[in-house]
């Protein structure tokens, strides 16, 4: 199986009623080779950004090294007071995220609108 290169697209989105949110849209495989794409893109987000959506709907494969990168990013976000909401995970990865404790740092949502609305809670 050939690994699909990780792509991360950063964009701004207006979420009603909370306002501007930064969205990181992941695509491809997230593995140890994804460090620059995942952490590099996250580090480009200003500390003043307080709401981040993570979109995993384009992710086909995520291994333990990739999960470690996501956890590292979420810990860094937590330290700067950034809130993260997550959506688009395939059911298998939802179970894995829950088992490894990622849900301490984020809530998993079924879709983008639900994740967006969670910032107002």
What does each model-found stretch correspond to?
Residues 2-43:
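STAS-typified acidic loop motif
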Residues 89, 112-113:
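Short, ordered loop/turn segments at secondary-structure junctions
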Residues 32-106:
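Amphipathic alpha-helical interaction surfaces in cytosolic regulatory modules
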Residues 107-111:
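Short acidic-hydrophobic, aromatic-tinged amphipathic segments that line or gate anion-handling sites
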Residues 113-121:
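A charged, well-structured terminal subsegment
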């Amino acid at each position: 199986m050939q690994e699909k290169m990780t792509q991360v697209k950063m964009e701004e989105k207006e979420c009603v009623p909370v306002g501007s949110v930064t969205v990181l849209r992941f695509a491809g495989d997230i593995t140890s080779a994804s460090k620059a794409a995942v952490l590099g893109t996250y580090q480009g987000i200003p500390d003043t950004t307080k709401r981040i959506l993570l979109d995993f709907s384009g992710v086909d494969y995520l291994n333990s090294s990739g999960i470690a990168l996501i956890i590292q990013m979420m810990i860094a976000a937590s330290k700067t007071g950034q809130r993260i909401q997550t959506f688009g995970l395939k059911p298998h990865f939802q179970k894995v995220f829950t088992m490894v404790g990622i849900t301490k740092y984020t809530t998993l949502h079924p879709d983008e609108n639900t994740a967006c609305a969670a910032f107002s809670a």
